[in-house]
UniProtKB/Swiss-Prot annotation:
The lineage of its organism: Bacteria, Pseudomonadati, Elusimicrobiota, Endomicrobiia, Endomicrobiales. GO terms for cellular component: ribonucleoprotein complex; ribosome. This is Small ribosomal subunit protein uS11. Keywords: Ribonucleoprotein, Ribosomal protein, RNA-binding, rRNA-binding. The gene is rpsK. GO terms for biological process: translation. It comes from the Bacteria.
Length: 131
């Protein structure tokens, strides 16, 4: 028929049967990215502040980080994830609010670990802004 199309992929969502999933939060001054993986590192769901509908300087706000984390949390709850271990990276303003967003979506948090890279006197930092 003219209105029907054959789907190439399967329309069924796969259920997550593993143990504790891992949530990686990258929080910079300009954006927040949340990625949820299984134990092997395969991505289950991800979102950023831009994907969540925020534009420009609003992407770097704590509210954008909370909404982004909550949307990813709802996605993986639909797949079947119940427990997550959080790995947070970066100095941005959305660090704590992203954790609260994941918690408010109904996910249980087992561990929180900060994996922000710290230089041992490596590269020279950029010059300070004068406004």
């Amino acid at each position: 028929m003219a209105g029907e199309k054959n789907a190439v992929g399967s329309s069924k969502k796969k259920k997550y049967t593993g143990g504790v999933a891992k949530a990686y939060i990258l929080s910079t001054f300009n954006n927040t990215i949340v990625n949820i993986t299984d134990e092997k590192g395969n991505t289950l769901a991800w979102a950023s502040a831009g994907v969540s509908g925020f534009k420009g300087t609003k992407k770097g706000t704590p509210f954008a980080a909370q909404m982004t984390a909550a949307s990813v949390g709802r996605k993986v709850m639909g797949i079947g994830v119940k427990q997550i271990a959080i790995f947070i990276k970066g100095p941005g303003p959305g660090r704590e609010t992203a954790i609260r967003g994941l918690q408010s979506s109904g996910l249980g948090i087992t561990t929180i670990k900060d994996i922000t890279p710290v230089p041992h006197d490596g590269c020279r930092p950029p010059k300070l802004r004068r406004v």
